[in-house]
Every structure is written in C-alpha cells, then in structure tokens.
Regions:
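Short beta-strand/loop motif that positions the catalytic acidic residue
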Residues: 647-649
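Short, surface-exposed "cap/lid" segments of acyl-processing enzymes
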Residues: 352-356, 361-408
Length: 698
C-alpha cells in the first residue's frame, strides 16, 4: 500500500508541473478553417512528442496484432460471450472505490451515491458483481469515472499527448491519474486478480489479462481498421471519446432519459412529418415514406447510420471466435494484383446462402446470382453501410462481391502510379477491370461458376455503375443483367460545392464552441452505432418509431457530413503523397511527425482538389472538360435508351440541384423511383425502401 501512495504523490507532482506547463487548447485564428485535425488538436494538444508517441503506439499495435488477436481467437472460442461479460462485470464492480472517490473529490454527490448503490446491489443481488441488476433492473448507471476526470475538474490541464504501450490514458494528466486508479482499485489488493485500468500489466492475473485483451482488441480493431495511419485514427478517436467521458455524457444522457420517463414526458408524441408534395414535373415512380419526421435534407442523411447489418452479432460468441458465424465473419477477403510492384487490392465476397431443401432433403434448384456492389466515397467492404447493403442482397439469394470505392487510399495505392480518383471515365474503366479480375479469381477457385450478374452502387459508386453501363453497351465484357444506382450525384462539380459548404459551415465559431455543438450528436451516433436497429416499418408503434429519430440541428448535421467527405479525401491524399509526393503540399509525410501535414491536408477543399490535384493528373485536359465528362449528363443517351438501367433517388438529396432532378426524371422516366424523404442515403433503413431495391433488381 505504501508503494502505491508514494507513487501517487510522485505522479501528482509531475502532473501539476506538466499540466501547468502546457494546455491542450490552441488559440483560434478566425482566418483558418475549423477542420477535424484542428478540433483534435484543440482537445488533445499539438502533439509535440509525436515521434515518441508513435513509437510507443507501434508497440501497442504489434501486441494487438500478433499477441492479442491469436490469443483472443483461442480464448473467445473456448469461453462464451456471457462468461466474458460476467468477468468484465466483476472487474468493474471491484473498481468501485476508484469511481466513487473520483466523484467525491469533485463534489459530484449524485455520482458517488449511484456508484455506492451499484456496488451494494451488484455485490449482493448481482452475486459478487457477476451480474449488473443495478443497471438493468433499477436504472442505476455507472459514472465511468476515474482520477483523470477528477484532475480535470480541479482545473489541471491535460498536458501534451502521451501514449504509452497498452495504457488507456492519452495525456500526461490521465496517465498520472492511472496511478491513483490502480491504488484505489480493490483488485490491486486481491491476490491474482490484478487490475483492469491497464490493458495488460505485470500484476494482472492471466484470466484478467486475457479477458481484457479479448475485449480491448475488438475495440482497437474497429478504431484502426481500414486506416493507412493507425496512430492518427487512434489518437483522433481516443481524444473525442475522452471528451465524452470528461463530460460524463452517457451517465447524464441515461439519467435524463429516466427522469423524463418518470415525469411522463417520454415517450414524446411523434412530431408530424411535413407534407411532401409530389413535383408536377415528375414522371418517375413516387414512393411516399411516412413518419419520417421533420428535418432538413442533411439531417435526413445522417440516418444512414441506422442502416446496419442485422445478423452481425452473436449472443454466445465474440467476433474473433471461430464459432461466430455472423454476417461479417462469413465475409471472404481476397486479394488482386492490379499492377506489378503495386500493393494488392482487397475485395470482399459472400457466397450465396445455403439452398432450401425439398421434403426429401434435397436442395431445391435455383439460379446462380451474383450482385456486385460499389460503395460511395470512403466506402470499404468492412464498413457499416456496404456490409448492411451486402447482407440485404445476400439474404435475398445473391452472392455478393464488394469492391472498395475509388475514393479510398486502398484503391488509390493499388492503381498504377497511385493515380488520383475523380475523373469518371478513368475510374469506371478501372473498376470494370477489377470486376473482371475478381470474377476470374472467383471462378478459378470455383466460388462462382456462371452467375447471373447485377451491378449496383450507391452515391459515388452509383455514378460508376451508370458509367460502366455505358462502357458495357459500347464494348460488352462482363454482361450485367441489370444496373441499379442509388442516390448517384449528377454533377460532381455541384456535389463538390455542396460538400465544401457543409465542411465550412462552422468556420464562424471558435473550436470550443464547435466541440460544444457537436459532442452531443457524436454521443448519440456512437450509441446508435453500438446497436443495430431493425428495418423501419410504418406499422410500428410511436414508441418504436421514436427510436429512429436522431437529434442533430441542421448546422451540426451539415458539418458532420462535410467532415466525413473531407476525411475520406484526406486519407486518400495522404496515401498518394506518401507514395509519390504531391507538389502543392508543403509538408512531407515524415514517419514520426505528421501533425502539420494533416492540418494542411484537412484544409483542402473539393474545389481545390479538382483544380490543383486532379487536373495535374491530366495535363492535356481542361478542367471544364474533366467536369463535363464526369457528369451524368454526358451519359444521357445511354440512360435514356438502356432498359437495364434503374435509379433510386431521394427528392431532397442535397447533392442534386433542381436541374439535376429534372434531368434524371425526364431521361429515365419510369425507370427511376423517387422517395419523398431521406436526403442522401438516409432512408436505406426503411423496410419499404429495401423492398423497392430488391424489386428493382429482379
């Protein structure tokens, strides 16, 4: 005990020195944009020890990949998920003194009382903390407090970013707080129990360590997956998540909900959806979506996160388990070499579902069907929307092939010369070549034989789908039965302007004001992404329907959507700059100091990308020609005459101008369906929309 007390006072002294010496907040320059990296640096500091932090993170990354992953596969295959959860519950229950003292020392009396009640209830009714009846029966929620939060409440600045191997703290203040967390954790004083503050530690028991690793690795994998700079993703997500913790967002949100229910103010009566009048000029099919609720087109679009794979979790087994047969685990990742001496491109494949059997137990004959799916900007096979779309198709009898968007770093680095995307004719030719290679690869291994193939894409992938339809009409190479584009932009120039406006919508605010505006929405999003909602049905009760309405003001919704588009472009540009250098950029992609480069990359607008970066890829082509050939108006003849082409769109998609809507409608006529709401992809969670997609592909 004395050892921990001495260490605690020592680290407290260091904490005050470092905290006073440096603050995380950076003075705001009103002439500069509010970008993702600027917000990250405002919350976490400018990372002057970036080289050291990246080196330490590399150790964590190595352990997660080469120790935690194989150990987790074995452990989670032997130990069912409920047992792993119960062990975690016991560890959390024994950490009660840490959370209670943290609340007491910052005069958060309600939190201290709730933590004490939780400990008493879970230790008795919950059988030593194995179960959590305090949460599930009596709505007594954990504050998730620690001493880092206490020090923050005392006004101690976080200091600079400090990453140490396998520790959950990410700055000087929170690292010092870990010592106090350990000293006040009951597991520290129970032989062979160990403590749960660190991911792994010499004083942890083997069981605690392995259990923590199996849980931590899954979170780590989600944070760094699909990243070409793991440290950047990790720091970014850790910084934002820590801000939610410091504000005790989950605790306050749950208590607010409980109090409103007790007061009879929840569930609130559903706000009526404003009437959407079918335009007089519309010739295509009109699909009315009821009970969507009020909201701007961008607010509608944020509901994309509600479109999730349904069979993507197992009650009995964690994701690493060999017995977990959820939809994501049935995905086969396969690699293609597009060019010699270039990184291979990974594509995803799901086999057709098992055939139904007749009364004699024999498989019922069926057609072999393959759906090729092209995601939008930043979309890769493991991400949420492509996975949900693939599951929708797979459940309805299709084998599914998913190819990463051209607007990803993976696709860019696999292309010859690391060519930048955005010129529709070139991108579509490259995608068609990859589809052909993937089909040959699948046939070689007898995963498909002679399937009936349909091509579908959404957003930017929808544009590629329509351009490939034109290429196939002029030079048939694959033989698609049908094409379906969902919410394709018409004009990349117009779409780029809209995306830039959204990303710059909060430039008038100080960084802290931006954080205050978006943090609640970020918490709501994280809560929704943790649990998949069933498809929305219009005959649901008002209580059920209310769960699908996300709270985000129009300005915040626009800013978050713009950040997503910009971050996808940033990751792609970073990969290209690392590969061959991009002349307009002034900072080099140095291995251990990249913060200034990211600040520069984040400020690049889509307009600037087209004029300075994409145009330089085609020195003999004028910019207006690049725009014109990347516009769906250039495909007017094909769209009008090819009966295999279908489009599903939202009448209020913010990436379409009024002229764009009229062009699509007059050109496609009865082969386009307009939904009354949804913005850009924000209605895919509606059962009615999902059924329409499947019907259009028949």
């Amino acid at each position: 005990m004395k050892r921990y007390i001495r260490q605690s006072f020592l680290f407290l002294a260091v904490l005050f020195l470092c905290g006073c010496a440096s603050t995380a907040a950076i003075k705001h320059d009103n002439s500069q944009q509010i970008t993702l990296s600027k917000i990250e640096n405002h919350l976490g500091g400018s990372d002057p020890w970036e080289g050291f932090n990246r080196s330490m993170f590399a150790v964590t990354s190595f352990v997660m990949d080469y120790i935690a992953r194989p150990v987790g596969i074995v452990y989670t295959s032997i130990i069912p998920r409920p047992v792993i959860t119960h062990i975690k519950n016991i560890c959390l229950n024994l950490a009660y003194p840490t959370r209670a003292l943290s609340c007491l020392l910052r005069a958060h009396w309600q939190g201290a009382g709730d933590e004490t009640l939780r400990f008493l209830v879970n230790s008795t009714v919950g059988i030593g903390g194995i179960f959590d009846p305090a949460e599930y029966w009596w709505n007594i929620h954990s504050t998730e407090s620690d001493f880092g939060q206490t020090f923050a409440a005392w006004g101690i600045a976080p200091g600079e970013t400090l990453t140490l191997p396998l520790l959950p703290a990410h700055n000087v203040r929170d690292t010092a707080g870990l010592i106090f967390d350990i000293a006040t954790d009951l597991k520290t004083y129970i032989p062979y129990a160990g403590e749960t503050g660190a991911t792994i530690a010499p004083y942890s028991s083997a069981l605690t360590t392995v259990n923590n690793l199996s849980l931590t690795h899954e979170v780590f994998k989600q944070v760094v997956s699909d990243s070409n700079d793991r440290y950047k993703n990790y720091r970014q997500m850790a910084t934002f998540f820590r801000e939610l913790q410091l504000r005790m967002w989950r605790y306050h949100a749950l208590n607010t909900r409980d109090n409103l229910i007790k007061a009879g103010k929840l569930p609130r009566p559903l706000e009526k959806s404003p009437a959407v009048i079918k335009p007089e000029w519309l010739r295509g099919e009109w699909l009315e979506l009821k009970d969507f609720g009020p909201g701007s087109p961008v607010q509608d679009s944020l509901r994309t996160i509600l479109f999730r794979a349904q069979d993507d979790s197992s009650y009995w087994y964690m994701p690493p388990s060999v017995f977990n047969n959820c939809f994501s685990n049935r995905r086969k990742d396969r690699n293609l070499a597009l060019f010699p001496n270039r990184p291979e491109l990974t594509y995803a494949f799901w086999s057709m579902p098992e055939p139904e059997e007749d009364k004699n137990g024999n498989p019922v004959p069926r057609r072999e069907k393959l759906a090729v799916l092209l995601p939008g900007i930043g979309g890769t096979a493991p991400s949420a929307t492509p996975t949900a779309f693939a599951e929708l198709l797979n459940k309805n009898g299709y084998a599914v092939l998913v190819i990463d968007s051209t607007f990803t770093w993976q696709f860019t680095t696999a292309r010859s010369g690391c060519r930048l995307p955005g010129f529709l004719p070139d991108d579509a030719r490259a995608v068609r070549k990859i589809i052909k290679l993937a089909l040959n690869d699948l046939k070689k291994d007898e995963l498909v034989f002679n399937p009936e193939i349909i091509l579908t894409g959404y957003s930017f992938g929808g544009m590629h789908t329509l351009k490939i339809a034109e290429l196939e009409k002029n030079d048939p190479q694959i033989g698609f039965k049908k094409y379906l584009a969902v919410n394709p932009p018409v004009s990349l120039a117009y779409a780029a302007v809209q995306a830039d406006k959204m990303a710059e919508s909060m430039n008038k605010y100080q960084p802290q004001q931006v954080v205050d505006k978006v943090i609640n929405t970020a918490g709501i999003f994280m809560a929704n992404m943790a649990n998949a909602q069933v498809p929305f049905k219009e005959n649901m009760s008002d209580l059920q329907k209310g769960a699908y309405r996300l709270q985000a003001d129009p300005e915040t919704a626009a800013f978050l959507a713009g950040l997503y588009f910009r971050s996808s472009m940033r990751n792609m540009l970073f990969a290209a700059h690392s590969e061959r250098g991009l002349i307009p950029l002034s900072h080099l992609p140095v291995e251990f100091t990249r913060n200034k480069l990211y600040l520069e990359l984040d400020k690049i607008t889509f307009k600037e990308y087209a004029e300075k970066y994409l145009a330089s890829e085609y020195p003999g082509v004028k910019l207006d020609t690049l725009y014109r050939k990347s516009d769906l108006n250039s495909l007017a003849e094909t769209l009008k005459n090819d009966e295999k082409i279908y489009v599903l769109h939202s009448i209020n998609d913010f990436l379409l101008s009024e002229n764009d809507r009229k062009f699509l409608d007059s050109t496609l006529e009865n082969r386009i369906t307009w939904t009354s709401r949804g913005g850009h992809l924000g209605n895919l969670y509606y059962e009615k929309v999902q059924q329409k997609i499947l019907k259009m592909l028949e």
